[in-house]
Amino acid sequence: MFPTVTEFMNYGQQTVRAARYIGQGFMITLSHANRLPVTIQYPYEKLITSERFRGRIHFEFDKCIACEVCVRVCPIDLPVVDWKLETDIRKKRLLNYSIDFGICIFCGNCVEYCPTNCLSMTEEYELSTYDRHELNYNQIALGRLPMSIIDDYTIRTILNLPEIKT
């Protein structure tokens, strides 16, 4: 007789424990019900990137002194710098500067260590193409400033600010 009573008590304890676990899960589900959705409708809504966002690199041809510091600090030796030594003034003259964004890891070392600040990171992150050779940008393509997301009237911008808990 006692084994049946203890089995019945164990069954009751297990039932109460299971109901408590289901209740805890249900409370978590209800706490998420009143939050705003995380998903954005991408082509029509875009997040405003932070100031420190590392997007496409912008290059200013006139400031570059062809010192090749960007090539030396790049972990994959990516920027291609072609220059010619001007013997009469004994300075390097920049001929071509290009970066292949299909290979670039967007680490930002080239921007950080550039002595003349001719490189900067932009907020542009839409670099998708159908041909990978289109990701090889020369100094003309790198010199174009991207259109700001904030200025585009066809796109609804969403601030990407962390929630402040009070």
From Swiss-Prot:
GO cellular component: chloroplast thylakoid membrane
GO biological process assignments: photosynthesis, light reaction
Co-factor requirement: [4Fe-4S] cluster
Residues binding [4Fe-4S] cluster 2: 74, 104, 107, 110
The reaction(s) this protein catalyses: a plastoquinone + NADH + (n+1) H(+)(in) = a plastoquinol + NAD(+) + n H(+)(out); a plastoquinone + NADPH + (n+1) H(+)(in) = a plastoquinol + NADP(+) + n H(+)(out)
Residue stretches making up the 4Fe-4S ferredoxin-type domain: 55-84, 95-124
Entry keyword set: 4Fe-4S, Chloroplast, Iron, Iron-sulfur, Membrane, Metal-binding, NAD, NADP, Plastid, Plastoquinone, Quinone, Repeat, Thylakoid, Translocase
Protein location: Plastid, Chloroplast thylakoid membrane
Membrane disposition: Peripheral membrane protein
Pfam families: Fer4
Keyword match ATP-binding: no
Keyword Lipid metabolism: no
Function: NDH shuttles electrons from NAD(P)H:plastoquinone, via FMN and iron-sulfur (Fe-S) centers, to quinones in the photosynthetic chain and possibly in a chloroplast respiratory chain. The immediate electron acceptor for the enzyme in this species is believed to be plastoquinone. Couples the redox reaction to proton translocation, and thus conserves the redox energy in a proton gradient.
Family: Belongs to the complex I 23 kDa subunit family.
Protein name: NAD(P)H-quinone oxidoreductase subunit I, chloroplastic
Gene designation: ndhI
